[in-house]
Amino acid sequence: MKLRKLFREKVSFEKREKLKKIMHYKGDITYQKNVKPYIKGFLDGQKKEIETNKIIIESLHGKDISGHLFALASKLNNLNNYNVFIVAKDIERAQGILDVYNLKNIKLVKHMSYEYGLYLATAQILINDNTFYPFFSKREGQFYYNLWHGTPLKTLGKDIEGEFLEFGNTARNFMMTDSLYFSNKYSANKLLKSLDLDGVLKSNVYIAPSPRNSLLFDHDRCKKIKKELNIENKKIFIYMPTWRGNKKDKTINFTEENILSSLEKKLPNDVIVFYKLHSMITKNFKFKGDRVRPLPDSYDVYDFMSAVDGLITDYSSIMYDFASQDKKIILFTYDY
């Protein structure tokens, strides 16, 4: 009775009804295969042998090519005996990034396509910095490596108010991994506890250097980026707010637009602020001025940060990486 009462207190009526539908679902698998090509690809792939020379890299559900996995892909580009695929939602944008950085040996596969499902089922090596969606299940003979993308300064998993039991897919992904990589002990402890995996996870957990941080110290790239964008005589800042953990909050875009509009009006002429919003809120968001501009799609964010003079953020763990450069950090915590 206590468990039932706790469940009703923590889980809204709407979510309980949704859970009932899922538990009693008797859908036609043929329908699923026809409507969702990635499901068909994944199921077809179960009948095929695992390809030992194939590597799949997915960052933030295909929304970006950046950070740890961009740095890793740059190194894997030199391995001619592997077929390396990066998952991308926007193939044209992703191809532009590969072209800029001359990553000729890296191929692309469109997120949620038939080929995507097929490759997830047949690639021997799977690398992610977030999670694969719930339809994915690792086969025997596959190796799954997760390089978690951030340091959890805020709450995650069961610690997020109103998100009871919604961390299940993340926990499930972690349980399937062969190895988990974190840049510090704090991240490892915080994540595993918030996902209820502390003491039960069988994966190898490593505390290791951040591959993406090496990009911050490339002084040649710093000069080249400033020259390419004609900003050599400007003070450059990058604004990167974090995700606030609520997909239903429709005011987020409005808030960010107000912030950027205010900056555009008040910044002096010798200062430019480039912004990169969290991948969870960038859909349909557009703002561009003279002094406030979106981060160009053709640059990896860590590569670009080698050329900036300071970072503006709120709770984003990117501040920890940026601090290694000994540059200015402005914490703009307007909702603290």
Model-predicted segments: where are they?
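Residues in the short beta-alpha loop(s) of Rossmann-like NAD(P)-binding domains
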Residues: A88-E92, S279, D335
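Active-site and donor-binding regions of nucleotide-sugar-utilizing enzymes
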Residues: N53-F217
